[in-house]
Amino acid sequence: MRHYEIIFMIHPDYSEKVSVIIEKYKKIIHHNSGIIHRLEDWGRRQLAYPINKLHKAHYILLNIETFPKTISLLETDFRFNNAVIRNIIISVKKAINEPSPVIKLKEEKKDKK
């Protein structure tokens, strides 16, 4: 099994259904003997540039360990799912469990308040 980092952006019109979409991808990963090492919901964020006339999107980060065939299934689903407007899948050398810089920044802001 290999390690992957996946970030995908969900159309802002589907923000209420984010948990359902996440569960769908978690089922695909677990059904194919995959392990989720990190799952982060970054929330709705401003895009660097408009995509299909959209200025915001809901970001999700996954660090998983799975077989390449599972990645093919995820890529196909991302491609045909209208809720997912962009995605990137990167192969990494080892599992990443610590919080991402985005989450660390959010926690620091909460601590300051």
From Swiss-Prot:
UniProt protein name: Small ribosomal subunit protein bS6
Annotated keywords: Ribonucleoprotein, Ribosomal protein, RNA-binding, rRNA-binding
Functional description taken from the UniProt entry: Binds together with bS18 to 16S ribosomal RNA.
Cystine bridges: none
Family stated for the protein in its record: Belongs to the bacterial ribosomal protein bS6 family.
GO biological process terms on file: translation
Gene Ontology molecular functions: small ribosomal subunit rRNA binding; structural constituent of ribosome
Pfam families named in the record: Ribosomal_S6 (PF01250)
The organism of origin for this protein: Buchnera aphidicola subsp. Schizaphis graminum (strain Sg)
Organism domain of life: Bacteria
Key word Transit peptide present: no
A GO CC annotation given for this chain: cytosolic small ribosomal subunit
SUPFAM superfamilies tied to this protein: Ribosomal protein S6 (SSF54995)
InterPro entries according to UniProt: Ribosomal_bS6, Ribosomal_bS6_CS, Ribosomal_bS6_sf, Ribosomal_S6_plastid/chlpt, Transl_elong_EF1B/ribsomal_bS6
